[in-house]
Structures are given as structure tokens and as C-alpha cells.
């Protein structure tokens, strides 16, 4: 008959006499104790008892430059104090010191890990208070070789929060109490923020005794160690320092004794046998994947296997009776009831007499298979057909499966149902679990896709590639040739262009339109709508037999602009073009950086000399701009201001290198009179390099060029329409010649032209002997073409060629092939119009909020000022007066996109400051709106320069 501890009456645990405990070294030493057995009186149980506490090691978090000198202080009921020796300069201290203390069943153990210092008070590295009653309840009053892994916490002085600082390993030993005779005081809640513990069934003792780590309550893990006659109780374990995330990172560097390996490995193989020893019943534990089974060998009797065990360790002998499949312990040893395994052990052709006594199996092994036991008593299966071994019992292959061998003789399995292969032998249970997981995964993915997109009425299951039906055809008409409409599993419609093998969300029939065709008015008489192969809409005028992309209906919208400042119809392609260009720039970037030191007074000359003396490829490195006399650090803001100021200088018409297009157009073009400067070609080469650097590094210039100039950069053919933007009078003259019969007018036009540069008349022949050939009605088209080409290039051929050479040295002109002239202007100059609503929507605040009065006054000031002052304010904060093509949401900082920021800094007497590298405005807490306007206006108009804060 067994008592409450699961031991036979009159027998001591592990074959030792009552009153003996095992110390940390594993040797038996007679230690007097009042808890000598389960038969102790109730009064003795309620009195003081001896407990052996071994402080083994700790793993502390690495959070400083200097390593600590840790030691452990143990307090029992806040009275009795014990200390370990200190370990110098270590985050992984090991003490292995044992203390014998007097405790009651309701005692508290307070573990403190402190950092010793000779010059200051010892600092707390972590602490934890443990209520012994919780452990006794969990382990049915037994603390024998009980390893505790305790999470240590430290309290922050700033916010009084507790954070994990490490782990401590301690061993409790030598305590056995009868829980039925104890009076455990109820605990309202665990200290240090731990939740109250719940009563645990005493049957869990067997689980812990098997060596498994068992969570008692939050942050305290416990397990019963197996007894050892040699070696330290920690089993040669080593610890690595805790990472920031905490957690236990333990690994064994020394193999445990044979009897411990037998105990642990038998758990990993899900062996349906219960091993019973003196410390409790061992329950097998399932491992996800066992080790590779040993090669086939002669099975040894179990008595031979356990013959080498030490005398003080009870072997986990196994008896297989002929009448049942359950394993029982040796005579005289009691244990928990053993469940009958689901499948019996099959009888094989083994010569081992122990295996011959096993019961017959309901499902015999397949032909050529054999069951054996290894030296640790673990079952494995031998396949003599393939000369391989397995831990798992072989079962017939599921329907549709086949076993094969590859060229190297390795066995694999073929699933003809799904046309897949696997190295793992399939069974029905594993396939069922996999199919269940697939179904759950598909359901979760479907629910996640439909959560925020559509209503319940629209969430109907649809095939991923469902074809469009007749019901889907609406008033928009059929899709263009080569297009197809499909539907996703979440009912979202997309369109496939089979000609270029692309997909898109937009309907090609309505792409780029502000409203649908249903709401648009009728076309004028003789007009028709058609679509190109790419799905782009155009209009056919049958009256004049012409086509156009512009809607002829009066008041028809030309298409709303997207976030990139281009029509929405082209926004998708422009975004792709821009990403392709940025990819080319990044993939050809060079490491390190180049320094360019300039002064504000001689900005043009300093920049010219430093850029021209460098090889062109060096200009692709990251720029580090330094203004002499200013201590600013260039994280992007200084270089933005350098590009802004230098572009204002080099494109200044006062230098006679460029000129305005006309009186009403302030776009720039090359000045034909630039030859008055003898070094003008070198300057144009420098400007070409500079403009290419702006494109390459993603910076904006102050002002842009004419559209014909951008077309020359893109190597596009110029037309008569391009003259209209730079010389409207000349354009009107050519149009008159084109539309009228010049033979009747007698204009006396010849294929030659004269023009004046700086008072000098220059004669130019449009073609050979052009001054002798008259323009007639028959050859006037040739005349208009030659005249257009001459007007766009007159006097600037060499300058344009040199400019493009300098540009091509830094950025190959082939990289610009993605863009048209308007897109090139957009990425070079940005957007000049400032959208205040977009600005305010993409602004963040620090120590302010959107309702702070200073913030409200700031936006009032922005709205009341004109565009020029807004641009000055933007240039003051960001380094440039232009807005990126994506709006204020794409303002760039030092490490990528960084939004406009307003931060509360300083006193009301201070001027506003800016951090151009981070797009941040330091706005002091002014007391009135007038004061804010005065200080802000003075800052953006009267100040310049950088400094370090």
C-alpha cells in the first residue's frame, strides 16, 4: 500500500533511509530533518523544517559597458539573510553554493542579485519573491532536487515599471511534507506583480519528475532533476547571456550519464512504457522529430542494458507480461496507473527471448519489417527491403501513394493525388491534419482579405480567374482588343492586357476620366469615341478625318491630376517611370562621399572649379556641402540649399548664358549671344554636369527651361507647335504661310534668313543655294520644316552640344528615355504651387498639437501670405522652395521620407530656427499672433546660414 507520496509504506525515496538528503554534488549525507517521512505528525508539519537551497548560476542582461560583480542575497521571511560570494566581471555568474535554512510551509524566499561596488551602494540587478506554499501545493509537498528557473525583475526609478533583467537558477532539496496535514495560508496575490496561483492537481508531480520544465506561475519554472552519483547537480550546463528579449537559452555541453540519457531519450520517442524510479513516475514526452534511429543491430536483453547503472540509482526495469501490453514497475515499487497503448507491440522474427514474449499485434508489420530495441530500451523498426530504420511504426501507404528510390538510392514517396513528392513516410493521421490545416488557412486568408473591403452582400465565393459574363457587360461597351476582365477571390475586379502581359485595377474603358461615360453629354455631330490597343481613349472627327485625345465636348474635364501633379490617366505609368529612374541611379551609385566647400559670396566660381576638376563619375557619390564660416552638418538639407542657390546663380540671365523665352514666358533657353564669354562652352559643360547632379541626387533647381529644350535633351523631333511657347509672333507667321496660298500674295520668300545678334546681322541659308530658290505653294512645307528647325537651334548648336556632353558624363541620356518633356520638368523642378491643405495634412508636431494656439496662428499666417512668402518659408525650413512631385507627403529627410515638423523650442524672445535636414521648424511659444508674424517674417527674410546646435 502506498502513502500520499506514491512510495511503498516503510520505504524511503530512492532506496535511502529516512532523514537523509542528497546535496548539490549528488552524494548522500545524513542531514537531520523534521520531515522524515509521510508519517510525521501534523504539528511537526506546521513547525520549522530544514530546506537545502543551492544557488547555482544566473544569466543577466547585458545593458552596460562595464560588466557587473554579481552576488546573490537570500532572505527567508525577510529575517534570515544568506549571501553568496561575488563573481567579478560576468554576466553569466556561477556560484554553486548551498545553504541550509529553516522554513515553514508559508515562508517566502526573497532572491536578490546585486552588483558589488567598492565606492558606492551595491546596485540591484534583479530580484524575485517566491511563496513556498505555491511550490508545495504544486508538487504535493515534495521539494527534492527541484530546479527553479526564476525570472528576475528590476524596478525603474523613472516610471516605477518592472522590467525583466535576467534569470536565476536555484535548487530546492530535502523537504517532504504531507499536504493533507498542512494548513496553507491563502495568498491574495503574488508579489512583484505575479498573478495568484491556482490549486494544481498533485498528479502533475509525475510530469515534473520526468524532467520536464513546469510553469508554476508567471516567471517561475520548475522541474525535478534526476539523481546523480557523480558530477555537479547542474549537469554541466552552460548559459549564454540573455538578449534584450529575455528568454532562456540553455544548451547542454556535456552528455548526461547513461541512465539520464535513457530517461530523457525514452521521453522523446513517445514510447508507450512508463519508467518508475525512486523519485516518481516518468511520463514519456513526445518530441517533434526524433533523432536518426541507430543502424540495425542485435537486440540486447534489458537486464544487460541496465547492468551498468550505479547502485544508488533504481533502474527503470520494464516487464512485459504475456497477457497485456502495459509495462509495470519492479516488485515493491508503486506508481500511477498506466494507460493501455492504442496499438500493441507486434511480434517479429527477433531471436531475443524478451521480445518473443510480447503479445500478438492486431495489425502485423508489413513483409520484411522487424521490431528491435536499442541499448536504451527504445523501440525502432527495421526495413530489410530498403535496409533502413525508423522510429515510427510502419503503416500501409494511404490510397494514391507510392514508394520510390532516386538515383542515389534514397527513398521518397509520391502522392499521385496531388502530384507531389516528399521524403517523409505518409500516414492517414498526418494527412488528415495537413488537410485540416490547409482548410483553416484558406478560411483565415479569405476572411482577412474581405474584412475591410466589401460588405457581406458582396462577399460571395468566386473563382480566382473567373471569366467575365454577359451580365458584367455594361454601358461602357466591350473591352479593347486583347483585354480581359477577371475577378479575385475577394470579389475585386482587375483587368489583364494580354498584349503586354500586364494587369491593372483600372478599367481601360474609363481610365483617366473624372466621371463615367454615362454621365457625360453627347458628342458633337460627326464625332466618335474609340480606344487604342493600350486601352487609351481618343476621339475621331469624321468631318475633317482627324483624331485627337482631347474631348471635343464643351466643358468636358481634361482629367483630374493625381498626387504626382500629372493627369490621373498617366499617374500609374509616371510612378513606374520615376521608380525605374531611381533604380538606375541607386544601382550605379558609388560609396563614400565628396566634399564641396564654397562661400556664399563666390558660390558660382567655387562650385565651378571644384566640380570641373573632379572626374564625372565622382559626382555620383554622396554630396557633403560645406559653406565656409558655417558649421552645418550636411544630412541633406545643406545640399538642397546649395542646389537651390547655385541654380539661381548659373541660370541668371545677367551672366548672358541663358535668356528668358519671351516677354511673357520666364522659362529659360540658351542665349545665342553667350559666345561673348570666351569660356562659355566650359561653363555650359559645367551647367550640364550640375543639372545632371540635381536629377541624380533627387534635388530641385530654382527655375526650369523651355519645353523645346527638354525635348532636345530627350532627342525628340521639334515641331512647329513648339515655336509657339518661345516666339508666338514667329509661330503665327508660319501658320499664316501654311494656311494661305503664297503664290497669290507675292511675299517674295527665299530659302534663306537673316537674324541679328548683338547688332551683327548673320545670314543663314536653309538649304544649299537657298538664297536663289524661291518659296512657292509646292515647296512651302519644306520651307516651314527647315524654318522650324533653324528657329529652334539658331546660334546655340555648340552650346547645346556641350551642355548635353556635360550632362551625359554624369547621367547617361538613355536613362531619360522613360519620360516625356513635361515629366522631365516635373522631376527636375518639382511643383511650384503650394497646397496649404496638403501641407497642413502632412505636418507632424512635437510638444505641440494641432489645437495649440501657436500652431493655429502658424497656419493662419501661411494662409494669409502670398505664394512668394510661402515659398520663402518653405525654403527656410526645407532648403528648397519647390514641393516634391508627390506633395508634402514625400518630403525627403536625411534617411528617406520625412514630413514637415513643427516643434516647441525655446522662449518667446527667440527667433524661429529650422533644421533643413529634417524638415523641422523650431517655433517658440509666442504669446500673440502679431509676435509670431513678426518673428517668423524676420527669420525667413533677414537670416541665412547654418550652425551646429
From Swiss-Prot:
- The EC class name is transferase
List, as start-end ranges, the regions of compositional bias called Polar residues.
Answer: 347-359
Q: Which UniProt keywords apply?
A: Developmental protein, Notch signaling pathway, Repeat, Transferase, Ubl conjugation pathway
Instruction: Report domain WW positions.
Output: 363-396, 395-428, 477-510, 521-554
The record's GO CC annotations read: cell cortex; cytoplasm
What is said about its interaction partners and assembly? Interacts with N.
What is this protein identified as? E3 ubiquitin-protein ligase Su(dx)
Q: Which organism is it from?
A: Drosophila melanogaster
Amino acid at each position: 500500500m502506498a502513502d500520499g507520496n506514491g512510495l511503498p509504506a516503510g520505504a524511503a525515496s530512492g532506496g535511502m533511509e529516512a532523514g537523509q538528503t542528497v546535496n548539490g554534488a549528488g552524494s548522500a549525507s545524513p542531514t537531520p530533518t523534521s520531515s522524515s517521512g509521510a508519517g510525521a505528525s501534523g504539528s511537526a508539519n506546521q513547525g520549522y523544517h530544514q530546506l537545502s537551497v543551492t544557488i547555482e548560476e544566473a544569466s543577466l542582461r547585458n545593458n552596460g559597458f562595464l560588466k557587473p560583480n554579481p552576488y546573490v542575497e537570500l532572505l527567508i521571511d525577510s529575517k534570515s539573510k544568506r549571501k553568496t560570494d561575488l563573481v567579478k566581471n560576468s554576466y553569466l555568474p556561477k556560484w554553486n553554493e548551498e545553504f541550509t535554512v529553516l522554513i515553514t510551509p508559508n515562508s517566502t524566499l526573497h532572491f536578490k542579485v546585486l552588483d558589488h561596488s567598492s565606492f558606492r551602494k551595491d546596485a540591484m540587478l534583479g530580484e524575485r519573491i517566491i511563496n513556498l506554499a505555491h511550490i508545495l501545493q504544486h508538487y504535493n509537498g515534495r521539494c527534492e532536487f527541484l530546479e527553479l528557473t526564476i525570472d528576475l525583475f528590476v524596478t525603474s526609478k523613472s516610471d516605477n515599471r518592472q522590467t525583466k533583467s535576467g534569470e536565476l537558477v536555484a535548487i530546492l532539496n530535502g523537504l517532504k511534507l504531507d499536504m493533507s496535514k498542512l494548513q496553507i495560508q491563502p495568498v491574495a496575490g503574488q508579489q512583484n506583480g505575479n498573478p495568484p496561483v491556482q490549486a494544481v492537481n498533485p498528479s502533475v508531480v509525475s510530469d515534473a519528475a520526468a524532467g520536464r520544465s513546469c510553469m508554476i506561475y508567471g516567471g517561475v519554472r520548475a522541474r525535478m532533476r534526476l539523481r546523480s552519483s557523480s558530477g555537479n547537480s547542474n549537469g554541466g550546463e552552460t548559459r549564454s547571456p540573455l538578449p534584450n528579449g529575455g528568454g532562456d537559452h540553455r544548451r547542454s555541453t556535456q552528455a548526461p550519464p547513461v541512465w539520464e540519457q535513457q530517461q530523457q531519450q525514452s521521453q522523446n520517442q513517445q514510447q508507450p512504457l512508463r519508467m518508475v524510479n525512486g523519485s516518481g513516475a516518468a511520463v514519456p514526452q513526445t518530441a517533434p522529430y526524433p533523432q536518426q534511429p541507430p543502424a540495425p543491430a542485435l537486440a540486447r536483453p534489458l537486464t544487460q542494458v541496465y547492468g551498468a547503472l550505479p547502485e544508488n540509482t533504481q533502474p527503470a526495469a520494464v516487464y512485459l507480461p504475456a497477457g497485456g501490453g502495459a509495462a509495470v514497475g519492479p516488485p515493491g515499487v508503486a506508481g500511477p496507473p498506466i494507460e493501455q497503448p492504442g496499438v500493441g507491440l507486434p511480434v517479429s522474427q527477433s531471436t531475443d527471448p524478451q521480445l518473443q514474449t510480447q503479445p500478438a499485434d492486431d495489425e502485423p508489420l508489413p513483409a520484411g519489417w522487424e521490431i528491435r530495441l536499442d541499448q536504451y530500451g527504445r523501440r525502432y523498426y527495421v526495413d530489410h527491403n530498403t535496409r533502413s530504420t525508423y522510429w515510427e511504426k510502419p503503416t500501409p501507404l494511404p490510397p494514391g501513394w507510392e514508394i520510390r528510390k532516386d538515383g542515389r538510392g534514397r527513398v521518397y514517396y509520391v502522392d499521385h493525388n496531388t502530384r507531389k513528392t516528399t521524403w517523409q513516410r505518409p500516414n492517414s493521421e498526418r494527412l488528415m491534419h495537413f488537410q485540416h490545416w490547409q482548410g483553416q488557412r484558406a478560411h483565415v486568408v479569405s476572411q482577412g482579405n474581405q474584412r475591410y473591403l466589401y460588405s457581406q452582400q458582396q462577399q460571395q465565393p468566386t473563382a480566382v480567374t473567373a471569366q467575365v459574363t454577359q451580365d458584367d457587360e455594361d454601358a461602357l461597351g466591350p473591352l479593347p482588343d486583347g483585354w480581359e476582365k477577371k475577378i479575385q477571390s475577394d470579389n475585386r475586379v482587375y483587368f489583364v492586357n494580354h498584349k503586354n502581359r500586364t494587369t491593372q485595377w483600372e478599367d481601360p474603358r474609363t481610365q483617366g476620366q473624372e466621371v463615367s461615360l454615362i454621365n457625360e453629354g453627347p458628342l458633337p455631330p460627326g464625332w466618335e469615341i474609340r480606344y487604342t490597343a493600350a486601352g487609351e481613349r481618343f476621339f475621331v472627327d469624321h468631318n475633317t478625318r482627324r483624331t485627337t485625345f482631347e474631348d471635343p465636348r464643351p466643358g468636358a474635364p481634361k482629367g483630374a491630376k493625381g498626387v504626382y501633379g500629372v493627369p490621373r490617366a498617366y499617374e500609374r505609368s509616371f510612378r513606374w517611370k520615376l521608380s525605374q529612374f531611381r533604380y538606375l541611379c541607386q544601382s550605379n551609385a558609388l560609396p563614400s562621399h565628396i566634399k564641396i566647400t564654397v562661400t556664399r559670396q563666390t558660390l558660382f566660381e567655387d562650385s565651378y572649379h571644384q566640380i570641373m576638376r573632379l572626374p564625372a563619375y565622382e559626382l555620383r557619390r554622396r554630396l557633403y556641402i560645406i559653406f565656409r564660416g558655417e558649421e552645418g552638418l550636411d544630412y541633406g538639407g545643406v545640399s538642397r540649399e546649395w542646389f537651390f542657390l547655385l541654380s539661381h546663380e548659373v541660370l541668371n540671365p545677367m551672366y548672358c548664358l541663358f535668356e528668358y523665352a519671351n516677354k511673357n514666358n520666364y522659362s529659360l533657353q540658351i542665349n545665342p549671344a553667350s559666345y561673348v564669354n570666351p569660356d562659355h562652352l566650359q561653363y555650359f559643360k559645367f551647367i550640364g554636369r550640375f543639372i545632371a547632379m540635381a536629377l541624380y541626387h533627387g534635388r530641385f533647381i530654382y527655375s526650369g527651361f523651355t519645353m523645346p529644350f527638354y525635348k532636345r535633351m530627350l532627342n525628340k523631333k521639334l515641331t512647329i507647335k513648339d515655336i509657339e511657347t518661345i516666339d508666338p509672333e514667329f509661330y503665327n507667321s508660319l501658320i499664316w504661310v501654311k494656311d494661305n496660298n503664297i503664290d497669290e500674295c507675292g511675299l517674295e520668300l527665299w530659302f534663306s534668313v537673316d537674324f541679328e545678334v548683338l547688332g551683327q546681322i548673320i545670314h543663314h541659308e536653309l538649304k544649299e543655294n537657298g538664297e536663289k530658290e524661291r518659296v512657292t505653294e509646292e515647296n512651302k512645307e519644306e520651307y516651314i520644316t527647315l524654318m522650324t528647325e533653324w528657329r529652334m537651334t539658331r546660334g546655340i548648336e555648340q552650346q547645346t552640344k556641350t551642355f548635353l556632353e556635360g550632362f551625359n558624363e554624369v547621367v547617361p541620356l538613355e536613362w531619360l528615355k522613360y519620360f516625356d518633356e513635361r515629366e522631365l520638368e516635373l522631376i527636375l523642378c518639382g511643383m511650384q504651387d503650394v497646397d496649404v491643405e496638403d501641407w497642413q495634412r502632412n505636418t507632424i508636431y512635437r510638444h505641440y498639437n494641432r489645437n495649440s494656439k501657436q500652431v493655429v496662428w502658424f497656419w493662419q499666417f501661411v494662409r494669409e501670405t502670398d505664394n512668394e512668402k510661402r515659398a520663402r518659408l518653405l525654403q527656410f525650413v526645407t532648403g528648397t522652395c519647390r514641393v516634391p512631385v508627390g506633395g508634402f507627403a514625400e518630403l525627403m529627410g536625411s534617411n528617406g521620407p520625412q514630413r514637415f515638423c513643427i516643434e516647441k523650442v525655446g522662449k518667446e524672445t527667440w527667433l524661429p530656427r529650422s533644421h533643413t535636414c529634417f524638415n523641422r521648424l523650431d517655433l517658440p511659444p509666442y504669446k500673440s499672433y502679431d509676435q509670431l508674424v513678426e518673428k517668423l517674417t524676420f527669420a525667413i527674410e533677414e537670416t541665412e546660414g547654418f550652425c551646429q546646435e
